[in-house]
């Protein structure tokens, strides 16, 4: 059965009535238990966790109900388990577990939402029967939210259980592909190094033409990025990543990361640029999007990423180590806030480094174990090579590339096809002026 994606709008009055009920549930819990609870378990199950569940339910529905309404199942589980513990009856445990599984199934879009009302009504009736006002108000809040729940009909992908903010879980991957991440949990232990060169006579001619057309700053970097974007349009599995031993796809969001210097000096600070590109982008669109980010980075005295790092470094060492550990745990479960993902150099589709301006050959840059970046592409200075053509010695110019690839996102044959297509685009860059005829989808 096709999964439905449910959502609520904060403009719906029932959403705010639900929030009012949840707030009343918290107040009632605090009033009802005064002087009646003496054990630690009683405090946690009678006050702390039910109040947390009520607040969390309301916050998820109001702040993230448009895309992540399914996460309201988490506070429902917390509330139901606390309710069952306080009751101590086997029949209540069975009823609560059935209710939790049913709610999770429905709110995740696996069943029609019309069944949500009788489930909530059953819980509400049970609460009234046991004369539990805080629990009754919590159940009433769930009932009030029901009329506001709608089904997404735009045909687009919306996250559900197992998905991340920055990626959709690839549930159709082969079994061997899925289990590989458990045997090779780190990127540094699952990377493949690859070096290749491309003859750039046509590419340099193309760059000169683009500059004459008005893209005055068009460079090798823009051409390489445009070719990579077009490659993802044909080979979408290149835009996958591994996180928490699961395979995810970024879909049509190509997050390109690059480090730039504000000035070409050894003492100049580095700034991270992250530009979001689309598989249908042309070379001109890549040029404009990338240059906007470069301009922002160079004009700002201190970027958001710089300020965040400075804040972390102000923390004592042991506390900082704990903060990093906590961040890794959040990343494992896909719970890192979106604003942190946006400024993180460790999260993206690909990391480019152009060392040509430094006059050196491209390096084999390591992958990051933390984060999601599965591909590191470096290119360096142009080089000349003498070759024999038709019995004569001719001089050609080449650009060298190095790739560091996470082998867990796709197999070797797929990677070989990707590299060949990428180099072919750079040999015939004029195709980058027009959008691709078709954009392949990684997940149908």
Model-derived features: where do they sit?
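Terminal signal-anchor or tail-anchor transmembrane helices
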Residues: 26, 120-128, 138-150
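Membrane-helix interface and helix-disruption motif detector
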Residues: 31-47, 62-69, 81-95, 108-112, ...
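Canonical alpha-helical transmembrane segments
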Residues: 51-67, 100-106
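Alpha-helical transmembrane segments
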Residues: 14-28, 73-79, 120-121
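C-terminal catalytic/motor cores of large multi-domain enzyme assemblies
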Residues: 5-6, 31-32, 70, 85, ...
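Cytosolic juxtamembrane helix and N-cap/initiation of the first transmembrane helix
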Residues: 2-22, 38-49, 232
């Amino acid at each position: 059965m096709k999964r439905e994606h449910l959502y609520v709008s904060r403009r719906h009055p029932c959403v705010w009535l639900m929030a009012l009920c949840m707030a009343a549930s918290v107040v009632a819990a605090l009033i009802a238990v005064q002087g009646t609870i003496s054990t630690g378990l009683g405090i946690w199950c009678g006050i702390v966790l039910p109040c947390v569940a009520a607040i969390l339910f309301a916050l998820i529905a109001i702040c993230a109900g448009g895309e992540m309404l399914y996460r309201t199942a988490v506070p429902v589980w917390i509330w139901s388990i606390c309710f069952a513990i306080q009751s101590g009856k086997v029949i209540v445990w069975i009823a609560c577990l059935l209710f939790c599984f049913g709610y999770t199934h429905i709110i995740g879009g696996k069943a029609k939402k019309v069944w949500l009302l009788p489930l909530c009504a059953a819980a509400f009736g049970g609460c009234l029967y046991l004369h539990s006002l805080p629990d009754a108000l919590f159940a009433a809040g769930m009932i009030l939210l029901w009329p506001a729940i709608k089904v997404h009909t735009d045909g687009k992908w919306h996250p559900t259980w197992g998905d991340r903010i920055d990626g959709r879980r690839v549930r159709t991957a082969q079994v061997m592909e899925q289990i590989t991440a458990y045997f090779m949990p780190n990127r540094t232990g699952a990377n493949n190094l690859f070096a290749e060169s491309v003859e750039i006579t046509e590419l340099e001619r193309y760059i000169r033409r683009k500059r004459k057309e008005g893209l005055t700053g068009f460079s090798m970097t823009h051409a390489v990025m445009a070719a990579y974007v077009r490659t993802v349009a044909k080979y979408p599995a290149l835009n996958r990543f591994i996180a928490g031993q699961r395979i995810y796809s970024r879909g049509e969001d190509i997050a390109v990361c690059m480090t730039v210097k504000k000035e070409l000096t050894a003492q100049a600070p580095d700034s991270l640029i992250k530009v979001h590109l689309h598989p249908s982008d042309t070379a001109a669109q890549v040029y404009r999007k990338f240059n906007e980010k470069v301009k922002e980075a160079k004009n700002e005295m201190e970027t958001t990423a710089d300020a965040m790092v400075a804040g972390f470094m102000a923390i004592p060492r042991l506390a900082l180590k704990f903060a990093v550990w906590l961040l890794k745990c959040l990343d494992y479960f896909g719970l890192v806030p979106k604003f942190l993902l946006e400024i993180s150099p460790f999260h993206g589709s690909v990391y480019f480094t152009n060392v040509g301006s430094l006059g050196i050959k491209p390096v084999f840059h390591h992958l990051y174990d933390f984060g999601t970046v599965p591909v590191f592409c470096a290119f360096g200075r142009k080089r000349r090579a003498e070759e024999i053509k038709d019995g004569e010695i001719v001089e050609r110019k080449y650009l060298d590339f190095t790739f560091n690839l996470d082998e867990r996102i796709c197999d070797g044959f797929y990677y070989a096809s990707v590299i060949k297509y990428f180099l072919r685009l750079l040999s015939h860059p004029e195709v980058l002026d027009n959008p691709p005829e078709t954009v392949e989808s990684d997940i149908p």
